[in-house]
Amino acid sequence: MDQKRLTHLRQLEAESIHIIREVAAEFSNPVMMYSIGKDSSVMLHLARKAFYPGTLPFPLLHVDTGWKFREMYEFRDRTAKAYGCELLVHKNPEGVAMGINPFVHGSAKHTDIMKTEGLKQALDKYGFDAAFGGARRDEEKSRAKERIYSFRDRFHRWDPKNQRPELWHNYNGQINKGESIRVFPLSNWTEQDIWQYIWLENIEIVPLYLAAERPVLERDGMLMMIDDDRIDLQPGEVIKKRMVRFRTLGCWPLTGAVESSAQTLPEIIEEMLVSTTSERQGRVIDRDQAGSMELKKRQGYF
């Protein structure tokens, strides 16, 4: 990696660490959202750097839908234990009682009940006034226009037309009781930055990001990896072993794999540099309707 690129990564690192420390100093009850993906792994690494040699002054929160890949759950528990982090896991009890799942109820309803409502329940339950998230501006157009300090009202709603100015790295965290701030320390990072930083810092990631032979089937233009037996095959569908990996991770029925032979970080970086598609092309929830991500964020989604 050339010196110019290395300096760029260190500038991003310094900015993110500054934001994380600022939130810890300014808010009374912050939390770090932990979705187990590559961005969460980088954000957690930066937080550990920010407070080294001490422990994190806030817990990790995973809003569990019950449909993550098994390797993600294993990685989550192992990581929290290894780093001595307080891990809070919340699953929407109403959604569980209703038996909500992406196959029967569809991606939009599943996401709304198990993720958006689950997140709002958890934030209210613990009274968090600031929540870190690993979203980046290059991922999706609604995220591109969101501030680093993203104000949410007492109903957790985001108004993109009423955002606070952020001049010269000055962030406005003033809130009233019941309101909160979503904080995005990785806003100015790109997918390329994330992968090169993971390689530079030797950050552990979920093995699903690396190519391997996995059982998949084609459905709705997506390669779906079959992670357990909670699926009913449709006529003509056949499960086959194919060499695939994931560019983004979520609920396994809603996350498409990509055919790939990249089994190392340098190979992933090389593959990504020539890719002409978004990393979120495999996320079914982004296709629900036009502007679906912005609508979800207005309703309280991260």
Curated annotation (Swiss-Prot):
Molecular functions per Gene Ontology: ATP binding; sulfate adenylyltransferase (ATP) activity
InterPro entries to which the protein is assigned, alphabetical: PAPS_reduct_dom (IPR002500), Rossmann-like_a/b/a_fold (IPR014729), SO4_adenylTrfase_ssu (IPR011784), Sulfate_adenylyltrnsfr_sub2 (IPR050128)
GO biological process: hydrogen sulfide biosynthetic process; sulfate assimilation
Disulfide bridge positions per record: none
Pfam families named among the record's database cross-references: PAPS_reduct
Catalytic function, reaction form: sulfate + ATP + H(+) = adenosine 5'-phosphosulfate + diphosphate
SUPFAM superfamilies: Adenine nucleotide alpha hydrolases-like
Gene3D superfamilies, sorted: HUPs
Keywords, comma-separated and alphabetical: ATP-binding, Nucleotide-binding, Nucleotidyltransferase, Transferase
Subunit structure as annotated in this protein's UniProt entry: Heterodimer composed of CysD, the smaller subunit, and CysN.
The name this protein goes by in its record: Sulfate adenylyltransferase subunit 2
Species: Citrobacter koseri (strain ATCC BAA-895 / CDC 4225-83 / SGSC4696)
Source lineage: Bacteria, Pseudomonadati, Pseudomonadota, Gammaproteobacteria, Enterobacterales
Gene: cysD
